[in-house]
Design a protein with these regions (language model features):
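Cationic, histidine-enriched alpha-helical/coil surfaces that engage anionic ligands
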Residues: 1-329
Length: 329
């Protein structure tokens, strides 16, 4: 059977939702199709196609079947953001390796579209996960109002998601990426994929090391930059994983994903202050205000008290990760 991923971008975008047995569930990244026999340009195009397939498949899980159908797949939105981030990394990493600065414009468009999805994802995490974890003692009176405020903001954010995936910017972006993935534009003179992969992976490791040194400050922004650098390393490693022994790849990626997920959870906690601050900026009735604001402040304080210990554990995990031998070296 032919691999359908080369054409799934157009198939899903035009027909998705008509056959729920095929396209009804959120889609995680497919294993890379990069092969040792490929030239660097071919590996780039295969990676673009896979990223776009994931984008269009997950966007489709969020599109309504009719006017009465309201799609809200928390996991589908999460995987859609992941697929945009993977595509950003592919365009940035390959673009730098090939010396093709014009790919930065396409990467910027991916970043803009991903940014339009961010408010809904942040509020999903806040409502589904973060609101349910703090102790309720002493703040129960204000939590229902805080939840109602968050749910209303979440509804608005999800309306933004619907507008994004049905808008012309999304449509044109998908078409442009599909065209690039199927083009034969000369992008590099280097014909040796193994050497290209090693350079790109080493470049990501150097970025991680720089961010790791900065993260010793334990400042929120520096830890955030380390998380982003690790994410770029992980995605690049996954792109080229088929070129290397499976056992070594699996061992390395297991450590990398564990560290990245831990920093991701820490980032969610750090976002509580920002999300609550945005919710509190809206005007409310005076009789609801004090209880809700007390609950909001207690929530920020409860999560904030956990941050120092979590940061300490994150840096310990990072030190352990540094001792893991990269599978391409």
């Amino acid at each position: 059977m032919d691999d359908p991923r080369a054409v799934v971008h157009s198939l899903v975008r035009r027909n998705l939702g008509k056959d729920k047995t095929i396209f009804g569930q959120p889609v995680k990244a497919v294993p890379g199709r990069v092969a040792k026999s490929m030239r660097p340009e071919e590996a780039f195009r295969a990676t673009l196609s896979d990223c776009l397939a994931q984008i269009t498949a997950n966007a489709a899980t969020l599109r309504p079947q009719d006017s009465r159908d309201e799609r809200r797949s928390v996991e589908g939105l999460h995987q859609l953001r992941v697929s945009f981030r993977r595509l950003e990394v592919a365009l940035g990493a390959f673009g730098r390796e090939f010396g093709q600065d014009w790919l930065e414009e396409l990467r910027g468009r991916a970043k803009i579209l991903a940014g339009r999805l961010a408010p809904a994802r942040d509020l999903d995490v806040f409502v589904v996960k973060l609101l349910s974890e703090p102790p309720k003692s002493g703040v129960a009176g204000g939590l229902p109002q805080l939840r109602a405020r968050a749910e209303a903001a979440r509804d608005n954010a999800w309306a933004g998601v619907a507008a994004c995936i049905s808008g012309i910017d999304f449509e044109r972006f998908a078409d442009d990426v599909a065209a690039l993935a199927s083009s034969q534009l000369p992008l590099t003179r280097d014909q040796r994929l193994a050497r290209t992969a090693r350079r790109m992976l080493d470049r990501q490791v150097r970025r991680v090391k720089r961010r790791g040194k900065m993260a010793r400050s334990r400042e929120e922004g520096d830890l955030h930059q380390l998380r982003i650098a690790l994410k770029k390393l992980r995605y690049t490693a996954e792109f080229f994983a088929p070129l290397y022994p499976k056992r070594a790849v699996t061992r390395y990626l297991k450590q990398l994903r564990g560290l990245q997920n831990y920093l991701g959870d820490l980032n969610d906690v750090a976002n509580v202050r920002r999300v609550v601050g945005e919710l509190m900026r809206e005007k409310v009735k005076k009789d609801d205000d004090s209880a809700m604001r007390f609950a909001a402040g207690a929530m920020v304080g409860w999560y904030g008290a956990q941050v120092p210990g979590a940061v300490k554990q994150a840096l310990k995990r990072y030190r352990n990760f540094k001792r893991v031998t990269p599978f391409w070296q």
